[in-house]
Amino acid sequence: MKTFSAKPAEVKRDWYVVDAEGKTLGRLSTEIARRLRGKHKPEYTPHVDTGDYIVVVNAEKVRVTGNKEQDKIYYKHTGYIGNMKSISLGKLRDRRPELIIETAVKGMLPKNPLGRAMFRKLKVYAGPSHQHQAQQPKPLEI
């Protein structure tokens, strides 16, 4: 019996919508990253993008435990000397809540061109509405 290897043209991708309201950030992000990679499918192949599309709604209502709302700091560097920017999770939730889930999931995906292709299949929205009704996403309970 030969080892099965999925071909990019033969991969069937489904659309799922996930409601992040009241869900813990890490547990939610782990399952989203797993589905973006395609590890939940029997035809998973490490070097082929076999994952599904994930639409996340209510990103502003995702839950974190402990004092992470004030203690967790996100850092970025602009590339200029002395321009290290930092923002707490609480302030980031007020400004761009979708970035919280995007950052968590991006850190769980491979750091290569395949990981970037997987990340492009993630669509995150702060509120309850999204613009992907035409794809008829199925609800996914995590």
Swiss-Prot record:
Q: Which UniProt keywords apply?
A: Ribonucleoprotein, Ribosomal protein
Q: Which GO terms describe its cellular component?
A: cytosolic large ribosomal subunit
Q: Which PROSITE patterns match?
A: RIBOSOMAL_L13
Q: Which GO terms describe its biological process?
A: negative regulation of translation; translation
Entry-linked Pfam families = Ribosomal_L13
Q: Which GO terms describe its molecular function?
A: mRNA binding; structural constituent of ribosome
Q: Which PANTHER family match?
A: LARGE RIBOSOMAL SUBUNIT PROTEIN UL13M, RIBOSOMAL PROTEIN L13
Q: How does it assemble?
A: Part of the 50S ribosomal subunit.
Explain the purpose of this protein: This protein is one of the early assembly proteins of the 50S ribosomal subunit, although it is not seen to bind rRNA by itself. It is important during the early stages of 50S assembly.
- What is the similarity comment for this entry? Belongs to the universal ribosomal protein uL13 family.
Name of the protein described by the UniProt record: Large ribosomal subunit protein uL13
Q: Which gene is the coding source of this polypeptide chain?
A: rplM
